[in-house]
């Protein structure tokens, strides 16, 4: 009976350890995939000479972009901030800052009920990760608007 108990516990411990390794691999693979996707978008935007925020892929495979007034405009800078946080890659910091800065005028959108999506994903994450008080100022102004 003790032998059965011992093997059961050992089997359980082994299974738990394997799962963590598999989960870690899946997480790492997804971070790597996100890094490539965001890198591809940044290259496409830079190549176009226009400053745009990607929001979706169409059925035709084209990337669709939006202006800073669109409720989804903060998601791309926010994704860069999250990737910066997950990867620790210092090269992503100026990129996240650049795409966040492009939304600065959104803080004055008094007619927009989705201002939180725009500002918190971009400026909120920037402030959370850097402590830069200029981000805080934009967040507070958006709250007043």
What are these regions (language model features)?
Residues 1-25:
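Bacterial Sec-dependent N-terminal signal peptides
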Residues 20-74, 82, 86, 90-97, ...:
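Low-complexity, Ser/Thr/Pro/Gly-enriched N-terminal "stalk/linker" regions
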Residues 45, 87, 106-110, 130:
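Alpha-helical junction/boundary sensor with strong preference for TPR arrays
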Residues 69-84, 111-128:
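Well-ordered alpha-helical segments within folded domains of soluble proteins
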Residues 102-104:
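General structural concept
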């Amino acid at each position: 009976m003790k032998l059965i108990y011992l093997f059961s516990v050992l089997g359980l411990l082994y299974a738990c350890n394997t799962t963590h390794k598999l989960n870690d691999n899946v997480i790492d693979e997804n971070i790597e995939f996100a890094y490539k996707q965001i890198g591809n978008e940044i290259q496409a935007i830079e190549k176009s000479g226009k400053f745009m925020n990607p929001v979706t892929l169409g059925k035709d495979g084209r990337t669709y972009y939006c202006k800073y007034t669109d409720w989804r405009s903060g998601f791309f800078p926010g994704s860069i901030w999250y990737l910066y946080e997950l990867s620790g890659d210092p090269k992503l910091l100026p990129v996240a800052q650049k795409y966040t800065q492009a939304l600065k005028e959104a803080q004055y959108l008094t007619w927009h009920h989705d201002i939180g999506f725009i500002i918190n994903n971009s400026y909120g994450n920037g402030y959370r990760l850097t402590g830069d008080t200029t981000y805080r100022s934009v967040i507070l102004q958006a709250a007043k608007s």
